[in-house]
Amino acid sequence: GRLVDSVDALGLGEDTIIVFTSDNGPTDWPRYYKEGFTPPGWAGELFGRKWSLYEGGIRMPFIIRWKGAIPEGKTNDATVMAAVDLFPSLHALSSAKLPTDWRLDGQDLSKALQGRKVKRKGPVYWEYGGNPGILKPGNPLFESPTNAMRDGD
């Protein structure tokens, strides 16, 4: 609240895009289980935690505010937006110019941020290979495949 209030008090609300998001999934460090504790964090009704490609491990909270340009008090549960889509989407909302030789990963989903329907051009792909001996979920129940893809709604 104080950040948003300060931006508005300075008269910058219509010129400032504010994004609140976080890392994916609550922690699942094995040490918590070994010490008899449930790890901190909660994935709600979603299955999985960090280091898991189940929804509780990859879904991220995301709130965006741009006074006068992004509808207030609305939710969008239909658009699948990955972190890689954030830069192209924010760039499309801005008047900034990119060097012509830059190629952006991700998809511009700025219309979805503005409350309009958008269909992805292609699937979203997650890969979590890493070294399974180092970062393994503390709860074997949350061990997941090393690859996941979502295509369509």
Predicted regions and their residues:
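Metal-dependent active-site segment of extracytoplasmic phospho-/sulfohydrolases and closely related
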Residues: 1-31
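Short, well-ordered beta-strand micro-motif
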Residues: 64-65, 150
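Active-site-proximal beta-strand/loop segments in catalytic clefts of secreted hydrolases
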Residues: 21-24, 58, 66-68, 128-129
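Loop/turn elements at helix/coil->beta-strand transitions in domains of secreted/extracellular proteins
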Residues: 12-18, 58-60, 118-122, 151-152
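Generic, well-ordered alpha-helical scaffold segments in large soluble proteins
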Residues: 3-6, 66, 89, 93
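Structural micro-motif
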Residues: 59-63, 87
